[in-house]
Regions:
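Amphipathic alpha-helical repeat scaffolds of TPR domains
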Residues: 2-9, 33-64, 90-110, 138-159, ...
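Amphipathic alpha-helical repeat scaffolds
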Residues: 8-16, 24, 28, 83, ...
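TPR/TPR-like (Sel1-like) alpha-helical repeat modules
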Residues: 118-141, 161-177
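A broadly used, surface-exposed interaction patch
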Residues: 58-91
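Terminal, low-structured helical/coil segments at or just beyond the last alpha-helical repeat
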Residues: 163, 167-213
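Helix-turn-helix repeat elements of alpha-solenoid scaffolds
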Residues: 13-28, 67-80, 119-124, 163-168
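Alpha-helical junction/boundary sensor with strong preference for TPR arrays
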Residues: 27, 33-34, 82-85, 89, ...
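Surface-exposed cleft-lining segments at the edges of enzyme active sites
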Residues: 62-73, 106-118
């Protein structure tokens, strides 16, 4: 089986070139070599969502793409990845967390629509996937994390105990995140909540106490 750490190291080097298409071509190539692992599936999922969103923003800004069909390349690959992931890795924690993250914020990540997940059924997918996560990983804090972060529920973050924060760090640590952009985006997502969200929760509580006094 292809080594996901080696793949991420290759992606990291390609990202330093500042171009998207080389990363896409590399991921497409390794995707086709053998049945993709959960790690590769998650990486390709993240990367294509990020690229489709970025190219979409370029369109709004009127800036050029790297290729005339760049959006379609990423979108088609993204849908292939989602299909494979839902078929093979729906019960796996890392893939399940990532797809839950996207369906929870589907108004932003509508790029996932097209095959299994559509605008018409996304709310049902959201309900089903979070229920499956609760059933399969009842002790995990990571799936609870998603809706509270999306709602900027600072109070929830502030009320977490030190033991719960430690659990979150340990769970994220299981993913062995690397230096590539997508892994760093996930790390930043959790780090921000552990600092900025928690600090805002403290400030809101202090303000509330002052008002009550």
């Amino acid at each position: 089986m292809l080594d996901i750490l080696a793949i991420k190291a290759d992606v990291y080097q390609l990202e330093r070139q500042g171009k998207r298409l080389p990363v896409y071509r590399y991921l497409r190539e390794v995707w086709q070599k053998e049945p993709p692992s959960e790690g590769l599936t998650v990486l390709a999922l993240q990367q294509m969502v990020d690229y489709v969103e970025y190219v979409d923003d370029l369109t709004v800004l009127g800036e050029p793409w790297e290729a005339e069909n760049e959006y379609d390349l990423y979108q088609d690959f993204l849908l292939d990845v989602i299909s494979w992931g839902l078929q093979k890795y729906r019960a796996k924690k890392r893939f399940l967390w990532q797809i839950c993250y996207y369906v929870n914020a589907w108004a932003t990540f509508y790029y996932i629509f097209g095959r299994e997940i559509t605008k018409e059924n996304v709310e049902q997918w959201k309900k089903t996937l979070f229920e499956e996560a609760k059933e399969r990983y009842p002790d995990s804090m990571l799936f609870e994390f998603i809706p509270h972060a999306a709602q900027l529920d600072y109070g929830w973050f502030y009320r977490l105990t030190d033991e719960q924060w430690l659990q979150i760090r340990l769970e994220v640590g299981e993913w062995n995140l690397q230096k590539n952009d997508m892994d760093q985006a996930v790390q930043s997502y959790f780090d921000d909540a552990m600092t900025w969200y928690r600090d805002n929760g403290r400030k809101l509580l202090e303000a509330k106490n002052k008002t009550n006094n």
